[in-house]
């Protein structure tokens, strides 16, 4: 027999090449073509939250007496496969390549343009 109330086994975080602060472009879905800054990454779920993209309205109940309820608009997460890092200089989206620099440190660069991200 199996238990229907079993929770999903916690998975390990995925190594993401997108980081907080990166400018990304949405490549799939209803927000396709829009760009924004990554506010937060969720590596266990392989998702990102992008500023001004995938907005959802949420109704918030009052928490204290005398306070009224309100409607809050906030960003919902997107799957990381639906965004690409965007170069503001070249105005193009590209995949990210991780390479080891001459001094032995790991760096990220755009595959299409060769531009260093950090």
UniProtKB/Swiss-Prot annotation:
SMART domains: KOW. Keywords: Ribonucleoprotein, Ribosomal protein, RNA-binding, rRNA-binding. PROSITE patterns: RIBOSOMAL_L24. One of its GO terms (molecular function) is structural constituent of ribosome. Transmembrane segments: none annotated. The keyword Ribosomal protein applies. HAMAP family: Ribosomal_uL24_B (MF_01326_B). One of two assembly initiator proteins, it binds directly to the 5'-end of the 23S rRNA, where it nucleates assembly of the 50S subunit. One of the proteins that surrounds the polypeptide exit tunnel on the outside of the subunit. This is Large ribosomal subunit protein uL24. It comes from Prochlorococcus marinus (strain SARG / CCMP1375 / SS120).
